[in-house]
Regions:
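Flexible cytoplasmic inter-helical loops of multi-pass small-molecule transporters
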Residues: 6-31, 272-279
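Hydrophobic alpha-helix/TM-entry signal in multi-pass membrane transporters
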Residues: 41-46, 116, 139, 248
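Paired intracellular helix-loop junctions of major facilitator superfamily
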Residues: 105-107, 161-170
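Multi-pass alpha-helical transporter architecture, strongest
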Residues: 2-7, 124-133, 246-279
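Loop-to-transmembrane helix entry/capping segments in MFS-fold secondary transporters
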Residues: 75-79, 167-177
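Extracytoplasmic gate region of multi-pass secondary transporters
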Residues: 34-97, 127, 131, 142, ...
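Transmembrane alpha-helix termini and helix-breaking/packing motifs in multi-pass membrane transporters
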Residues: 98-102, 187-239
């Protein structure tokens, strides 16, 4: 952050606006919301980014736990050998997909919406494959590819979020966007996947003939599972990782909704983007 501050000069306010755009002071929240209500592209994009964040935060919160349960590795091994390459791939993919969408936008303005929409859709089969294969290497490859293709929405959310409103509303538009995305994504993504996993665990235990109050997930933890009877240990072996696996697959599948919202944004951009309608 310090290097950026010292080496990158902030462009003048309105530098990227179309010629002739009048500079005005920032507006209050109410006026900003009124302008945003006339921009369907903003709300479709916000819905898509929110779903993507919801799924992403949920998956990332439980990814290491899943790898430990499903493949028998340690948390440290999951972090170093799986999560680090996935994070690197995601960082490169964020830049690559953002750059691609920006380049295509010059001739095809809809690209800023359909590139991330396609990316989110493409990530689904790779995530499902990664969460269902028994091969750790193949799981890692699936996660790496999924991480690479899905993050185009990050560039899109800021480009569209600022591009559909007048200069004086941009900061407020991004504030509204991030409030919704972070509230639902951070707040409910991990909670949702944990709750779904618990439901699958309880149902799995009952299906194997064990009362719900007789066996909890915590009792299946490797550090204490030896205290259980052989029968309960067997039940743990059946449902401990499978319940989380099912939850991860469901969460990954929800990226389809995020993809759909970005594709719905696409036809609105010609009308809603300010640089396409400078008047």
């Amino acid at each position: 952050a310090l290097v950026f501050k010292l080496t990158v000069k902030e462009p003048p306010r309105g530098y990227t606006d179309p010629p002739g755009t009048q500079s005005k002071e920032r507006v209050e929240l109410g006026e900003a919301i009124r302008e945003l209500t006339t921009k369907p592209a903003f709300w479709y994009m916000t819905a898509g980014a929110t779903v993507a964040a919801f799924c992403g935060y949920g998956i990332s919160s439980f990814q290491s736990i899943f790898l430990v349960r499903a493949h028998g590795i340690t948390a440290g091994e999951a972090a170093i050998w799986i999560n680090a390459p996935v994070s690197l791939s995601s960082a490169v993919g964020t830049f690559a997909t953002g750059w691609l969408a920006t380049q295509l936008y010059k001739k095809h303005p809809g690209a800023i919406a359909w590139v991330p929409g396609i990316g989110l859709a493409l990530s689904i089969p790779f995530y499902i494959f990664a969460f269902t294969t028994d091969n750790l290497l193949l799981a890692a490859i699936g996660l790496i590819i999924a991480g690479f293709v899905k993050y185009g929405y990050l560039a899109a959310q800021y480009t569209i979020g600022q591009g559909v409103v007048s200069m004086r509303v941009r900061a407020m538009a991004i504030a509204v966007l991030l409030f919704v995305v972070n509230l639902i994504g951070y707040g409910f993504g991990p909670l949702f996947i944990g709750a779904i996993s618990d439901i699958f665990f309880s149902n799995g235990v009952v299906e194997l003939g064990v009362a719900v109050d007789e066996l909890t997930r915590n009792q299946c933890h490797p550090s204490v599972i030896a205290e259980l009877s052989d029968n309960l240990q067997s039940v743990c072996g059946e449902v401990y990782s499978q319940s989380l696996q099912s939850a991860m697959v469901i969460m990954a599948s929800l990226y389809a909704a995020g993809s759909l919202f970005f594709l719905l944004t696409w036809p609105r951009l010609d009308k809603d983007m300010v640089d396409r309608n400078p008047s």
